[in-house]
């Protein structure tokens, strides 16, 4: 009975997605329900997740695609992102060339959450 109730509740909750990475991208929370946006450190306060600016498929904003296939493409006019450069971006708001991103959105993610988000972006 308890298992059935849990399954029903989870299936009704539209903020849970198949993977932790997709959940982070679409909701700004991990599967543990932790909010990952550091609103105190962020200049932009109205954003709660990646999808808000980047859209459902990661490419809603012109020249700001976060599909990893675009980020890691050396022909995009900037230094291609590697996994470690992407993690540095999340941790320090630095673009792939080392300059300040100045996006104003700061995330608090543990290593597992960062890896899961990157794996999701690689599938977009």
Please place each PLM-identified region on the residue numbering.
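Bacterial Sec-dependent N-terminal signal peptides
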Residues: 1-15
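Intrinsically disordered, low-complexity repeat segments enriched in small/polar residues
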Residues: 7-11, 98, 117
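Electrostatic cytochrome c docking/interface patches
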Residues: 12-46
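C-type cytochrome heme c attachment motif
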Residues: 23-30, 44-56, 85-91, 115-119
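Substrate-binding/catalytic groove segments of enzymes
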Residues: 32, 60-62, 94-101
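Gly/Gly-Pro-rich "capping" loops immediately C-terminal to redox-active cysteine motifs
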Residues: 34-85, 106-108
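C-terminal capping alpha-helices of c-type cytochrome domains
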Residues: 83-96, 105-124
């Amino acid at each position: 009975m308890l298992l059935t109730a849990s399954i029903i509740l989870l299936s009704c909750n539209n903020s849970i997605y198949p993977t932790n990475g997709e959940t982070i991208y679409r909701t700004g929370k991990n599967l543990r329900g932790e909010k990952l946006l550091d609103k105190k450190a962020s200049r932009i306060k109205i954003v709660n997740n990646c999808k808000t600016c980047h859209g459902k498929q990661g490419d809603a904003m012109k020249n700001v695609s976060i599909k990893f296939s675009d980020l890691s493409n050396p022909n995009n006019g900037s230094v291609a992102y590697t996994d470690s450069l992407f993690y540095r971006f999340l941790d320090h708001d630095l673009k792939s060339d080392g300059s300040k991103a100045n996006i104003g959105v700061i995330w608090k993610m543990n290593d597992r959450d960062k890896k899961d988000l990157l794996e999701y972006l690689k599938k977009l």
